[in-house]
A protein has these predicted regions:
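Alpha-helical transmembrane segments of integral membrane proteins
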Residues: 188-405
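Gly/Trp-centered helix-boundary motif
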Residues: 2-218, 222, 352, 362-378, ...
């Protein structure tokens, strides 16, 4: 009888039947609200959270990342920081954006259909006065008096903090290069271009070049090293012989020949650098996969029928990331040095490109202008130091001895 009462009190149970879950209020505690899949995806895994905490504890690496991120983001908006075109122009009640669009001089009451030279005093007078024809004769007086054409509205311009682009040739009134002054904070180079503007654009160019090359070389190197280490045998042997022949190819001669045939360009230089840079990671990744291929979890995955590519890149690659991340600082600094060296030798980007290597070459050719050498040196020193500190912190954060202590 007691057995029947107990059975009826708790509802039907038995094989294949489960009692209904208790009401949240029955136990005296509210059940936690369900977590949506979108919110779950936002959170890092416990392992990555430990790595992030370890990175945050490294003050030098964390603040280097902050400073570098700020500098890089600012350089992405270089056109709004250093440009020989105004950011916004108001002319006769209309708004123009010369940073993004082409406007002929006729759009502001001028005579030419070529692009307006906004630094010319005549063009500035036309914009400010609403298109007075006397701007071609007495622009300074009309601007000083604030004259406005009849029936028109006075205009205005908002300039970037540095009113010169990286390729703007300035009228110095003297010999170039010129020393730093109020108009050119870091002076000008030997073709009268503003050094500060070229440093801003050159920093962006160097970092973008380095990021593109590093990502592409890392992908190719990791895949090649993983295939060699995982499969071993003849696959490893053949790949190793190919790599030995490939790395013995004189890359500088190949670059000179390709540039002589195809001309110098940014993407061609990226292609050639990736072409000869991917073997840098192969040896490290190959060694990690050779070491891990006989571990128990790899054998278990094979026994369960997991595909080779899933084992390689979902299970084995995370364990090889420490050694891979350790090599990244060398790849990044090497890529920056490669770009600067090629530009210094004249085999890199076109001479008109805002390159830090070209600035270094100008410093060598103009020893009487020490500001060129100081600017190039401190730019390289700051950029490379920040990157090394950042990846040093990343390497420590990925170190299992610190992650699981």
């Amino acid at each position: 009888m007691s057995h029947i009462d107990t059975h009826s009190a708790h509802g039907p149970t038995g094989p294949g039947l489960e009692s209904p879950p208790p009401h949240p209020a029955a136990g005296g505690h509210d059940a936690p609200p369900p977590v949506s899949p979108r919110r779950r995806r936002r959170h890092l895994s416990p392992l990555n959270e430990r790595r992030w905490r370890n990175f945050r504890r490294n003050g030098r690496a964390f603040w280097s990342l902050v400073i570098f991120a700020v500098l890089f983001v600012l350089s992405l908006f270089a056109e709004f920081i250093a440009n020989d075109r105004p950011i916004v122009v108001s002319y006769d009640g209309g708004i123009y954006m010369p940073v993004f669009n082409f406007y002929p001089e006729t759009a502001f009451g001028g005579d030419f259909r070529t692009e307006a030279v906004y630094s010319d005093i005549e063009v500035q007078c036309l914009i400010r006065t609403g298109g007075l024809e006397d701007c071609f004769y007495e622009p300074d007086r009309l601007i000083a008096e604030g004259a406005v054409a009849e029936g028109a509205e006075g205009g205005w311009m908002i300039w970037p903090p540095i009113p010169y682009s990286y390729d703007t040739i300035n009228d110095l009134g003297g010999a170039a290069p010129s020393a730093p002054d109020a108009q050119h904070l870091l002076g000008t180079d030997d073709t009268a271009r503003d050094v500060a503007a070229r440093v801003i654009y050159g920093f962006r160019l160097s970092i973008l070049f380095t990021l593109i090359v590093t990502v592409l070389t890392s992908i190719i190197g990791i895949v090649a090293g993983a295939v060699q280490g995982f499969f071993g045998g003849w696959t490893d042997l053949i790949f190793q012989r190919i790599i030995e022949v490939w790395v013995s190819t004189p890359s500088l001669y190949v670059i000179i020949i390709l540039f002589a045939i195809l001309g110098r360009s940014f993407w061609l230089l990226v292609f050639v650098t990736v072409l000869f840079g991917w073997p840098a990671l192969v040896g490290v990744v190959r060694a990690e996969f050779l070491r891990a291929r006989n571990f128990e979890y790899v054998r278990a995955a094979r026994a369960l029928g997991v595909s080779n590519w899933t084992i390689m890149f979902r299970h084995m690659l995370p364990n090889a990331m420490v050694a891979t991340v350790t090599m990244l600082p060398f790849i990044i600094t090497g890529t920056i040095s490669t770009l600067a060296s090629l530009d210094f030798l004249g085999f890199g980007l076109p001479s008109s490109a805002p390159s830090l290597g070209e600035l270094t070459l100008q410093a060598k050719q103009n020893l009487q202008a020490p500001w060129l050498g100081f600017t190039a040196f401190f730019t390289f020193a700051i950029m490379l130091s920040l990157l090394i500190f950042i990846f040093e912190g990343i390497r420590d954060a990925f170190d299992p001895r610190k992650t699981f202590q």
